[in-house]
């Protein structure tokens, strides 16, 4: 019976398995995360500030000229109701503009959860923390494209 009492002291397995989300910030008060989308990879730093967003050394409105891409980039901040509270610096490489905007959005969402773990449930519910795994399907031999066949002539 002494063995059973020592087992009760350990607690249930669910208590031990639940990870506590801890704030991850470097010595300069920034949180860092990487985001990916298609062929693009973004490195994102988030710190408390006035709401500046810089992508590859330019203001995000200059780098992503299309309003749709700017909206994609700002979605996590708007969903978390933290507009104008963070300075965001991102470097992104590879892919096209749409993939790069998605990569920065993914990295920004992860960095926000590291900076402020309480935002995790809101961002998870919005689907911002999930890596979008859709990539271009490869071309197959005997086909014109990935699925399109060559033109067929009956006669």
Curated annotation (Swiss-Prot):
UniProt xrefs under InterPro entries: Ribosomal_Su5_D2-typ_SF, Ribosomal_uS9, Ribosomal_uS9_bac/plastid, Ribosomal_uS9_CS, Ribsml_uS5_D2-typ_fold_subgr
Keyword Repeat: no
Residues making up the signal peptide according to the UniProt record: none
SS bond partners: none
Top-level taxon in the UniProt lineage: Bacteria
Alphabetically ordered keywords of this record: Ribonucleoprotein, Ribosomal protein
Gene Ontology CC annotation, any one: cytosolic small ribosomal subunit
GO BP field: translation
GO molecular function terms noted in the UniProt entry: RNA binding; structural constituent of ribosome
PROSITE patterns, alphabetized: RIBOSOMAL_S9
Similarity comment: Belongs to the universal ribosomal protein uS9 family.
HAMAP family for the chain: Ribosomal_uS9_B
NCBIfam families registered for this protein in UniProt: PRK00132.1
Protein name in UniProt: Small ribosomal subunit protein uS9
Species this protein is from: Rhizobium etli (strain ATCC 51251 / DSM 11541 / JCM 21823 / NBRC 15573 / CFN 42)
């Amino acid at each position: 019976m002494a063995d059973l009492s020592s087992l009760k002291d350990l607690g249930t397995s669910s208590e031990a398995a639940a990870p506590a989300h801890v704030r991850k910030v470097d010595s300069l008060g920034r949180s860092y995360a990487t985001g990916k989308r298609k062929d693009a990879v973004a490195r994102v730093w988030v710190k408390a500030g006035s709401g500046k967003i810089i992508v590859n050394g330019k203001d995000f409105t200059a780098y992503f000229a299309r309003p749709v891409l700017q909206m994609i980039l700002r979605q996590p901040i708007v969903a978390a109701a933290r507009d104008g509270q963070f300075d965001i610096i991102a470097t992104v490489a590879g892919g096209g503009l749409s993939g790069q905007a998605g990569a920065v959005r993914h990295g920004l969402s992860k960095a926000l959860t590291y900076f402020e773990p309480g935002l995790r449930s809101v961002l998870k519910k919005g689907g911002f923390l999930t890596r979008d795994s859709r990539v271009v399907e490869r071309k197959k031999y005997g086909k014109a494209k990935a699925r399109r066949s060559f033109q067929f002539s009956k006669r």
